[in-house]
Amino acid sequence: MRLLEMRGLTWYVACIQISARHAGTMGMNMKTSVAIEKAIPVADPDVVRAEFRNAMARMAAAVNIVTTNGPAGLAGFAATAVCSVTDSPPTLLVCLNRSASVHPAVTENGVLCVNVLSEGHQDLSRLFGGKTPVAERFAAAAWSELSTGSPALEDALVSFDCRIVRRADGGTHDILMCEVDAIRQRDGGQGLVYFDRNYHPAGQAE
């Protein structure tokens, strides 16, 4: 068996000797060499990750700021990996990188608030998505509290105040199941989505 590397593909080539009895009148033995080639793609993990990120950049997603406060401290981060799970009971799913500086505060506090951003919140999203100190992040906007004590952005389109009821392993991330305790909405305004590595307003359909 030979192993050949060709442009990122691994090729296994097997040469098999097959004995076959000739069915003709002479009754001769024949040995036939058969080469079987099979192409087995072996993905480069770095290439796959890069392609996945590029593909996910084409999936538009709402931009949110997720906050927490409690015994483990005040923290907040920008997130697009947020979605609805069910309305019975009302539950959101939030994905949080375990290497993120906010991870200990969020998981130890056990509460969070998902604040859905509007088109005017691009700068605020950048603050919460970078390495800006916590105090400076929160000083850039007005906040209040709903039921859990997590900061609720005053001019968010919607604020979902939640308790973390379950946590699952998702590779590099924790998958947080968050049961909603309180909701605050405001009328008007356009949403903010992240698409193709840039911010875009998301208005109501005409």
From Swiss-Prot:
**Which of UniProt's keywords are assigned here?**
Flavoprotein, FMN, NAD, Oxidoreductase
Q: Which cystines does this chain contain?
A: none
List, alphabetically, the SUPFAM superfamilies matched.
FMN-binding split barrel
EC number(s) stated in the UniProt entry for this protein: 1.5.1.42
Which parts pass through the membrane?
Answer: none
Q: Which GO terms describe its molecular function?
A: FMN binding; FMN reductase (NADH) activity; FMN reductase [NAD(P)H] activity; riboflavin reductase (NADPH) activity
What this protein is reported to do is described as: Catalyzes the reduction of FMN to FMNH2 which is used to reduce pyrimidine by RutA via the Rut pathway.
Record PANTHER family = FLAVIN REDUCTASE, FMN REDUCTASE (NADH) RUTF
**Protein name, per record:** FMN reductase (NADH) RutF 1
Its taxonomic path starts at:
Bacteria, Pseudomonadati, Pseudomonadota, Alphaproteobacteria, Hyphomicrobiales
